[in-house]
Amino acid sequence: MAVPDTQPPEPTPAPKPPPLPPAAAAPAPPPPTPPPPPPPAPAPRPAAAARPQNGDLSTDQLLARPPGGPSEGWQAVVYQLSGGRLRPPPGPAERARHELRARISAPVAGCQRIAVVALKGGVGKTTTTACLGAVFAEHRGDRVVAVDANPDPGTLGYRIRRDTARTAKDLLANVDKLERYADVRAYASQTDLRLEVIASEADPARDEAFGEEDYRELAAVLERFYSLVLTDCGPGLLHSAMRAILPTADELVVVAAPSLDGARSASLTLDWLERHGYGRLAGSSVVVINAVRERGLVDVGKLQEHFARRCRAVVRVPYDRHLETGAEIVLDELAPATQRAYVQLAAAVADGFPRAPASGPA
């Protein structure tokens, strides 16, 4: 049976969506961001700082209040009453004392040998050696030794408190065993101020005088362990030890009594040195006019003028009762004027030392 030819019904169109509401107005775009400001110009580079020096690390630089303060005059009174808060600078006298101590304590190059001489005995040569050595030992940080090189029994060992009976001769008898400082120290007595003293033989029965070869051998040992070696020479200039002492001496101290014969003897000492090839030593020497009394009959000022024309420095040491006794010397028991004189003497002698080169960066 034939299927009738029929047309499919047309589809019903979908309903139209409702119209959209009108679009809202778009917001205005934000204003453009301004460009960032240019970076500031770099600050000018400071000049290169000076290379730091050791002086930049001084006490005054690093401590708010340096230790200590003025010790005399009105400056000391202000410092003490303020409990250390006020620290006025020291006065002229105190500055002068500090300057003397700085000269005494300056580093030296190598071992310095100081010979203390006098043409005649009894003028204070041994006393000068002991006091000069004590001042050096008190103010320096290195080792200082005084040696009695008297060919006869000397008295240097009597001017200190002995802590050993050993002598220079004993040291020389064992010289091949001296390898360290402690080995040498066993033959020396040490004072409270750190001065070491090697005494001479005290037994007059010993028939061997301290002579030229003895001193050469002793000096060769001491210069290995000490910065300063003071030699208390015997009276006169002709005994054999002087043939070793004078050629090796770096500094010479000539002791004179404040009298006509004492001054003449000291002047003759300088004459002899100049005639025998020691003109440099004589010209650089320091003369000590010893035991000067306030009301002496000799014009000490004229003596001082005479020696000032012949040597490097002249120092007066006043008479002192503590030294007159010939007993053990204690610096603190000296009169203040005597103490000042020995400090001045030490500074004058130290002025002749060659200074150690300043250490610093290469």
Residue ranges and their predicted role:
Residues A186-D192, E196-H239:
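Phosphate-binding/switch loop-helix module in NTP-utilizing enzymes
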